[in-house]
A protein has these predicted regions:
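Conserved N-terminal beta1-alpha1 strand-loop-helix module at the mouth
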Residues: 2-77
């Protein structure tokens, strides 16, 4: 996993559960454009189910999962493994 080194100033966009799917991608594109225009780094935290989609469609943002569980693979129904959000 690539380590992130974010230098200030930065801005975080956390859409919570207001956007999903293509709307989450659109918001990511707006954040990317703002980052390029201002030179300010943007951390974007879409819903976990949109993380891979946004990663493929939008470049230039620091993407972070909203949540993960610090557990090893195995039992843990409903848990989010660290390996799943790489």
């Amino acid at each position: 996993m690539k380590k992130m080194k974010i230098k200030p100033p930065f801005f975080e966009v956390g859409p919570k559960a207001y956007f999903c799917g293509e709307r989450a991608v659109e918001l990511g594109r707006v954040a990317q454009a703002a980052s390029e225009e201002t030179g300010v780094s943007v951390i974007y935290t879409p819903q976990l189910t949109d993380l891979a989609l946004v990663s493929r469609e939008v470049k230039g943002l620091y993407l972070c999962a909203q949540h993960m569980d610090p557990i090893p693979m195995g039992k843990g129904q409903g848990s989010i493994l660290p390996e799943a959000v790489k």
